[in-house]
Amino acid sequence: MRIVNVKDYVIIPLGKQGENLATRVLFPFANEWRLLFGDGTFQLLHQRQSDAEPHAVTVGIDGENVVWNVENVDVAVPGVGKCELNYLVGDALAKSITYSTKTAESLSDVGDTPPEPWESWVDEVLQAGAQAE
């Protein structure tokens, strides 16, 4: 898996259209933002080039990094998009940072059409809820 440390990039290279779980994006802000603002939650929004609205992306924490494992739905549309990492303390937005993203166009058949962005997010929420019971 390709590792992308966002501190090294102005535009985050997400990979090529059709790839799935080939790129792991690391945002090195988890500890820093917790120390500055207190306990909270991270939220990542991603807007592909032709999307009218951003979609929520599942992120995790690994040490001091917020981690985004890029899925095929995130790179289904080639071109330049945007992502925004938000840190919420309660209902308040404590900190936010926005980056440009880049998905390279594939010259070959990109395989199965990925689900809509919200479908995979809803599936993950439902799975987490079932595991919590």
Language model features with spans:
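Non-transmembrane elongated oligomeric "stalk/shaft" segments that connect baseplates/barrels to distal
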Residues: K95-E133
